[in-house]
Each structure stands twice: as C-alpha cells, then as structure tokens.
C-alpha cells in the first residue's frame, strides 16, 4: 500500500460507461474514498459494494465521493452496478496499471488486494486500510472517514 501522507498518483481509467475518468476529476468536489476490490459479482466484493451503496447518503453529506477499481471490463462493471443499484463510479483497470501504482496487487502480482484509501483534494492520502478478508473493516473505515469529514468542507453544489 501507499503510505499515509504521500501523494496519490494521478491516473485515468475507463468507468462503467466507458468514459475516461481521472483522479483529478473524481476529486473536483471534495475528498475521495478510493477502494480496490478483486472482482465484480463475487460474494465478498458484492457485500462490500452494497455496504458502500447503503452509506451513499452519509458519504455525500460529508462531502466525499467514492470510486471502486478492479480489473474487470467496463461492461462487467456496468452489469454489476445495475444489478446492485450502485450509485458510484466503478473503474476498469484491466491491465492492473493503477492497481500496481497503488501497490495493491496480490502476491506475485496475481489478483487484487482489498484496500481503501481516503484521498483529499490535494491528492494526499489521509488514511488507508488493507483488509483482504475482513470486509467489515472497510465499512468501519468508511464510517470513520464520513465522521471525520462531516465537520469539514461540504461538497460544492453541482449545476
């Protein structure tokens, strides 16, 4: 994992709608919860995504945004989003370029580790958690990020 206090590397990846999305774009309204997960439609990843979905209102109220990254295609992400009514961006990193940049590749480069970063608008990593099999730790991490951000700057209104 990347160290807390370090700068989050800039990237651009296609989202579930095949639109290129950069880290800078994701940060335009406030801090970002960037989470990495192994695969769409697996039991653990579905549980994690749905727990984030269920926190969407609180996340947005705190001025945060969310994006998930995994090596599946935009089409897979679109189906996953639609089936589970996810309201956040899913980014496709088929070549695992960003996964490697953020140092969350699995052992010997296989797979993806379950990791979540809180990145501020200046691209500094404010906090992070790595918990491959303890999905509840990611939900607790997000709840803590929401609580910490709730008193801070609110999301800029969209037009």
Model-identified regions with their sequence ranges:
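Chalcogenol-based redox active-site neighborhoods
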Residues: 1-159
């Amino acid at each position: 994992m990347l160290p807390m206090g370090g700068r989050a590397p800039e990237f651009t990846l296609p989202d579930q709608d095949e639109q290129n999305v950069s880290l800078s774009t994701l940060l335009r309204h406030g801090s970002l919860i960037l989470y990495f997960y192994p695969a769409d439609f697996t039991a653990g990843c579905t549980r994690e995504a749905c727990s984030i979905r269920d926190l969407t209102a609180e996340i947005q109220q705190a001025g945060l945004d969310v994006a998930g990254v995994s090596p599946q295609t935009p089409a897979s992400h679109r189906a996953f989003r639609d089936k589970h009514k996810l309201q956040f961006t899913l980014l496709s990193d088929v070549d695992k370029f960003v996964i490697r940049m953020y140092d969350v590749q699995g052992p010997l480069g296989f797979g993806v580790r379950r990791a979540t970063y809180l990145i501020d608008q200046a691209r500094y990593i404010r906090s992070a958690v790595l918990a491959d099999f303890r999905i509840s730790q990611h939900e607790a991490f997000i709840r803590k990020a929401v609580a910490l951000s709730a008193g801070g700057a609110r999301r800029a209104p969209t037009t």
